[in-house]
């Protein structure tokens, strides 16, 4: 009850003070103009930008996958998927928001997002120097908004492709009330059947992913909107690692059944109040239960459970001339439990060789309870008709590390000409340390939050009604990052310290054409450099996600009312990697060999390039709207190398061993089908 009281006290102060402040300002005006009407409109259609993202070729209708066609965004795991890395930051540095609420589970293990494409209303990517409404992030922010349900006769939409199938049910219930519910399930298990064996690996639990989203919304009168939400997703799979496999030959500790089972389930409620045309108040609350279980080797396992509660309060007003004021309060509460019987490896994504950081097998149970509080204010101030300034501040505190931050943030936009604007943005940021580094038994409970400072500047030019271009430069200074302590050092018991820093800098250019003459598209190019510095040795090395240049091109053409075609081309410099320059006996299994690595991230993979093409045919089946989508992934069949690894065959010696390349996805045809009843 004490925590609940503390939670609502700042909220009451925010709402009451802003209401009083706005009333006093408005009372000074001589003339009062009030627009009477329904202010709680349901937002049921996607934005134009989202529709364009959904049409990008080769993404199976997944608009979040389309963000990898934007400047400065790459997959952390190459063609194998993984979360996005933005402008030289770690994927863990990003924050994801869905309908204003923070979430961690937004991509499946194979890289596709957890959202039904028919439910997305808007996607915003803030790649750097984002505003005060976002916190607990030092990289970038993905803000995803799902659309509201449609008050219509009951409708069922079914879609299927070679990769997944799904169903969406939507319609009105009572007056001013409507709902939708979506469920999707992957079809990967049809291509990777149980019992299939290759190179000593046998599938015993074919990989499956599924997800669901649901909303029930009640428009109360003209000024209130009450929305209940359900969200969830899961991924699972299992494989047997035998002595004959490469993994088994390298490290027999992994011989046996290996499986993963991860899921999350979320329930939430949001109340929006529009008491006046200039005022909006929002209260959002949700509960998220995230669970993960990994089993491998001879009885080794790692299980985790995160019981999370989120509360967000927001008040906004435009009653003060030339100002849009926002005040908000956030509370994020975590109860994280980690159970394990495993051989730990104490390393980070900037360690040269995790094998050298191998610890002794340990069993135990660890727990982290953390409450993260934030209070923020923001003012968008129209200084002149051509000059806009945004000033914000965000105060954050967490009761685990006991750290408090005050983060100032600002931006300035100047319209030099009606079609040309210059802008600059800056801010400071922090995030809670990685859980693995903060655990008391396997990490350092005294590890501190990671910090960053962002600055960016650029220009936008509306060339014509249909053509526009944008250029931007940026710099990210990263500090207090986690550094793995050498297990042979005198302070090895610390495991991790805040002795790593880094920088990421670059320039990006985008030219975009809006729909005209039956086609639209964009071309982007970027140059960047991302480095990390060991603050103890003062050695600076390139970050493994450092991608000096990236080029993306997207185009879609409407042939007629039935046919659309599109293409996406991506090319980029290869990722950094640490080369293997030899092998050595495994100290725990002398008859087996481990790879011996050279200088950290000192080599570069070959250039990556990929062309995806797609055609969509719209028609009717017995009066019902339907569509067929034909796609060809990696149409040119480029052999994109994603890494190199030591491939033992049982006959290797230190003078005779095989290093093999790992390739990304080859030519892959796909077909999709969608029908609405």
Q: Which residue ranges define each predicted feature?
A:
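Membrane-embedded beta-barrel scaffold of Gram-negative outer-membrane proteins
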Residues: 282-286, 292, 415, 422-423, ...
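C-terminal beta-signal and adjacent terminal beta-strands/loops
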Residues: 562, 571-591, 608-612, 616-677
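Periplasmic N-terminal accessory/gating domains of Gram-negative outer-membrane beta-barrel systems
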Residues: 40-117, 122-130, 147
